C-alpha cells in the first residue's frame, strides 16, 4: 500500500498490548469468519461473542452489513471496492488486537488474497480464519433477505456465489460445518479452539 500522507510518524503507546491483555485476563486475537452469504457467519460470531462475554472476555463483533453504514459507506461491491472494504476492516481489527480485545469479524471476504493480507498485518497466530462451510444450496434455502433470488434475476450484480466467485480457505485454522451442524456445536468448536490455544482460560467444570 502506498501512503498518500507524508511526514507522519507512528507514536508508540506507553500502555502496551501485553499490559492490556494482562488486565483483561486473556489474549487478544482476530477471529475471521468467512463464507457465502447465508452461511451463518454473523449469527455464529455473535453466538461466540455471547459465550466469551459470559467468560468475562472483552470482545467486539465487526459485521459485514453494519460496517457499510459508516466506515465503508462509500464502497460498492465491485472487485476493487471489495478489496478496499477488507483492507479497512483488517486495519480496524488490528487496532482491536492492540487494545487487548478479541475481535470477531464476519465478512464474506471472498478472495483469498484479501484474507491473506489481513493475516500479514498481525503477528503469526493472531489471525484465526474460520471457514463457515455451507453449500450454495443450503445458503439459498436460508436466504430470508431474498438476495440470491435477486442475484439470479440480475438485480444484484457481482453477487458472491452467483456472478462473482468465492475462494474457500485452503488452510483455515477452523472449519465449522454451519450447513450441517447446530449453531451450538459450531460455537463450542470455536470456544474449544481458543481454550486449546491458550487465548482464553478453560471454564470450570
From Swiss-Prot:
Gene3D superfamilies assigned to the protein according to its UniProt record, in alphabetical order: P-loop containing nucleotide triphosphate hydrolases
Protein keywords: ATP-binding, Kinase, Nucleotide-binding, Phosphoprotein, Transferase
An annotated GO BP: sulfate assimilation
Catalytic reaction equation(s): adenosine 5'-phosphosulfate + ATP = 3'-phosphoadenylyl sulfate + ADP + H(+)
EC top class, as a word: transferase
Pathway(s) annotated for this protein in UniProt: Sulfur metabolism; hydrogen sulfide biosynthesis; sulfite from sulfate: step 2/3
UniProt GO molecular function: adenylylsulfate kinase activity; ATP binding
Residue sites binding ATP per the record: 35-42
Domain of life assignment: Bacteria
Coiled coil, from the record: none
Pfam families given in the database record: APS_kinase (PF01583)
Cystine pairings recorded for this chain: none
Catalytic residue positions: 109
Enzyme Commission code(s) on record: 2.7.1.25
Family under the similarity heading: Belongs to the APS kinase family.
Function: Catalyzes the synthesis of activated sulfate.
Protein name in the entry: Adenylyl-sulfate kinase
Source organism: Acaryochloris marina (strain MBIC 11017)
Name of the gene: cysC
